[in-house]
């Protein structure tokens, strides 16, 4: 499944033991992400305005809404190289699409201050990337969205392939922090558990 493909997402919270049993069941039918056979850490930074516009849109069930998320990948052992993305998550009448552009991880700090980093403004950027930049101008520069929380978890992902329509992910070890630090791949410094008991988010 392509990363920017339109999708309908369903999320479930399972006890850790039940989640692992379900993961093994899915693994018997859908291939694991190539190159990440034993999983990978995900570090995310979510944006919102000072009056929590994105949060309240979700709570009120607004049919057409967007939010900004920065995300970095990479493993400390180097098996997955560092990579940074800025993403627009767009929900429309229950369907979701993710538009994203790659950029140097260190450029995310500039974006967090409300500025479009120069690497995103290069004329060689694709049409899709320029669309993302236009949305960042709208949501970050004009509307004033800034990072409000950073989240870390470990993911196992199973995907039906570029021509398929199914992707199942298992996220464990969910932790967060509200002091906005520079995003670093595989950063362990997330002191707050998202939930009291260990769960799997599917």
Feature map (PLM): residue ranges:
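Phosphate-end processing signature that detects enzymes handling 5′-triphosphorylated RNA
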Residues: 1-201
């Amino acid at each position: 499944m392509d990363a920017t493909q339109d999708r309908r997402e369903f999320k479930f919270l399972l006890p850790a033991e039940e989640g692992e049993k379900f993961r093994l069941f899915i693994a018997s039918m859908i291939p694991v992400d190539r190159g990440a056979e034993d999983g990978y850490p995900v570090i995310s930074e979510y944006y919102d305005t000072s009056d929590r516009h994105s949060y309240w849109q979700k709570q009120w069930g607004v049919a057409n809404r967007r939010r900004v998320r920065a995300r970095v990948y990479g493993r400390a052992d180097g098996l997955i190289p560092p990579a940074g993305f800025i993403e627009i998550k767009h929900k429309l009448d229950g369907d979701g699409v993710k538009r994203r552009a790659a950029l140097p991880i260190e450029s995310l700090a500039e974006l967090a201050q409300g500025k479009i980093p120069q690497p995103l403004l290069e004329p060689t950027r694709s049409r899709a990337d320029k669309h993302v930049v236009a949305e960042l101008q709208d949501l970050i520069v004009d509307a004033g969205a800034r990072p409000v929380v950073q989240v870390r978890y470990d993911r196992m992902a199973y995907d039906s392939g570029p021509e398929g329509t199914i992707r199942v992910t298992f996220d464990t070890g969910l932790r967060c922090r509200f002091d906005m630090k520079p995003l670093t791949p595989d950063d362990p410094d997330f002191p707050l558990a998202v939930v009291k008991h260990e769960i799997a988010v599917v």
